[in-house]
Regions:
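Immediate post-signal-peptide N-terminus of mature secreted/exported proteins
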Residues: 1-13
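C-terminal partner/receptor-binding element of secreted or periplasmic proteins
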Residues: 77-122
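Short, glycine- and small/hydrophobic-rich beta-strand elements in well-ordered beta-sheets
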Residues: 27-58, 66
Length: 122
């Protein structure tokens, strides 16, 4: 999945701190689904500002963990219940817009195929 969000240019550090908290929440979770989410979730920052001045961040999620909740705030609320209000305000103040969400199966995997056991033994 590719999920693109726009973040206010003066709030990129706050957004990245929020995402670091998400990483910490996923890493500390005893839920194997949450740990698998962390393993396949990266966030890329686009250096060139959007026409409106906001900064685009692309969440690259592969593989998507079936039935897992990727809601940033829910992950944070579950892990840091005492910080709910502060986390919400920080995220709200940084967030400008959801720009796009693309999901679907991989049509073509360009990664090299691993050698099969029989081919490796010859």
């Amino acid at each position: 999945a590719l999920w693109t969000v726009a973040i206010k240019p003066d709030k990129t550090q706050a957004f990245e701190q929020i995402m670091a908290k998400v990483r910490a929440a996923l890493a500390a979770s005893t839920d194997s689904a949450r740990q698998r989410q962390a393993a396949g979730w990266k966030v890329m920052k686009i250096e060139k500002p959007l026409p409106d001045g906001n900064i685009a961040y692309i969440h690259v999620i592969s593989p998507v963990v079936h039935d897992a909740d990727y809601t940033v705030m829910q992950i944070l609320y579950d892990a840091f219940p005492d910080e709910r209000q502060a986390l919400y305000e920080s995220y709200r103040d940084a967030f400008a817009a959801n720009l796009s969400l693309a999901t679907g199966p991989v049509a073509v995997d360009l990664a090299p195929k691993p050698a099969t056991a029989t081919a490796a033994s010859h």
